[in-house]
């Protein structure tokens, strides 16, 4: 396995507690976390309570349903079943608080917050306490703990849920480096996306994302992925990797942002029209076709997961004009696949339009 590099660009020569070399920090610990061995165990009265979950991350997509597996047993096995209390909660990440998901005691159960009406305990087998989660949302991605409580003893296991999606850089209509952290969060939400995590950006870099503009991530750090080192992007002397400026002030500092859009439940399409349209006409045309004008996140997801390939620029909901290319060809932009952009043209300029219809 080749060595992976994380580079911290900092005006300070060193930071206490980090191994530094020539002012740059290298690490192959990409996430700073592990799921352990997939189970927990505890001993009481000579009997061991064991909770088992999966060691592998689960992958799903927005709008889908998923089951987070969790089982428990006793060693040695008990002759008769015991009453247990089960609790599921989502762990804290990137400064967000822990979230209670579901508590079950016998036939009584209670779900919490945004999980109400979307979760239930699955008990198809004896000593199964898996969590069924419906209508997946972007914010459902993360680590969940399954805890089984038997009297004074409790044991737990972790399950990691990831939504399939695509990371894309996003820039304000005012130009480069115009978004503080809160504006970056809003910008991604308006595009049907959320601010990407470092893990999502790193995975996108592994898949070839190369972008020389620094952008906010979910933990309020500012980073950018480089596949081909070059002078304006950290210099030729640095290895490929994700460059980091570290944490930045939520309000005072301004950058672009990396957004994460989940795989689509619906369909994005280029609306065939005998004439080109202004932005207002484009919105109305999608509505007349029983759809709505596509967001940037929806267009990227359609390009990534549905293979949308069209060499015609079209309006999007944010007032930008873009087009998706899966198979690069003459007169359709650079030689690499991607979503091309014309920026934010005058709203009276005429283009096609990309519409989105939900299945």
UniProtKB/Swiss-Prot annotation:
CDD domains from the xrefs?
A: Ig_LP_like, Link_domain_HAPLN_module_1, Link_domain_HAPLN_module_2
User: Which Cys pairs are S-S linked?
Assistant: 70-146, 188-259, 212-233, 286-355, 311-332
Per UniProt, the keywords (alphabetical) are: Disulfide bond, Extracellular matrix, Hyaluronic acid, Immunoglobulin domain, Repeat, Secreted, Signal
Q: Which residues form the Link domain?
A: 166-261, 266-357
Q: Which GO terms describe its biological process?
A: cell adhesion
What top-level branch of life does the organism fall under? Eukaryota
GO MF entries: hyaluronic acid binding
Q: SUPFAM superfamilies given for it?
A: C-type lectin-like, Immunoglobulin
For this record, an example GO cellular component is:
extracellular matrix
* Protein localization: Secreted, Extracellular space, Extracellular matrix
Q: What this chain does, per the record?
A: May function in hyaluronic acid binding.
- Its name, as the record gives it, is Hyaluronan and proteoglycan link protein 3
Whichever gene encodes this chain, its name is Hapln3
């Amino acid at each position: 396995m080749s060595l992976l590099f994380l580079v911290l660009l900092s005006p300070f020569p060193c930071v206490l507690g980090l191994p530094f070399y020539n002012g740059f920090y290298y690490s192959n610990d990409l996430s700073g976390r592990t799921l352990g061995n997939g189970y927990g165990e505890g001993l009481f009265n000579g009997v061991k309570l064991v909770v088992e979950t999966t060691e592998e991350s689960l992958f799903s997509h927005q709008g889908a349903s998923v089951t987070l597996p969790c089982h428990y047993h006793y060693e040695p096995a008990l002759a008769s079943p015991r009453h247990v209390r089960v609790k599921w909660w989502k762990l804290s990440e990137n400064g967000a608080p822990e979230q209670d998901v579901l508590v079950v005691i016998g036939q009584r159960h209670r779900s919490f917050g945004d999980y109400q009406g979307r979760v239930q305990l699955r008990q198809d087998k004896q000593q199964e306490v898996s969590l069924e989660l419906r209508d997946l949302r972007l914010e459902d991605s993360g680590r969940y703990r399954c805890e089984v409580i038997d009297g004074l003893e409790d044991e737990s296991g972790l399950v990691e849920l990831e939504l399939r999606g695509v990371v894309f850089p996003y820039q304000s209509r005012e130009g480069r480096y115009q978004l503080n952290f809160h504006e970056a969060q809003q910008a991604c939400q308006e595009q049907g996306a959320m601010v990407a995590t470092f893990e999502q950006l790193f995975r996108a870099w592994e898949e070839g994302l190369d972008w020389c503009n620094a952008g906010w991530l979910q933990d309020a750090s500012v980073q950018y992925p480089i596949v081909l080192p070059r002078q304006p992007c950290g210099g030729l002397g640095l290895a490929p990797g994700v460059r980091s400026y570290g944490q930045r002030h939520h309000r005072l500092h301004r950058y672009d942002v990396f957004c994460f859009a989940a795989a689509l439940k619906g369909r994005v399409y280029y609306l065939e029209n005998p004439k080109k349209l202004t932005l207002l006409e484009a919105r109305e045309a999608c509505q007349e076709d029983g759809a709505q004008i596509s967001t940037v996140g929806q267009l990227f997801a359609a390009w990534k997961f549905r293979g949308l390939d069209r060499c015609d620029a079209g309006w999007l909901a944010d007032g930008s004009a873009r087009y998706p290319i899966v198979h690069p060809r003459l007169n359709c932009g650079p030689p690499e696949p991607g979503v091309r952009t014309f920026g934010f043209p005058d709203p009276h300029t005429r283009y096609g339009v990309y519409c989105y219809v939900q299945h």
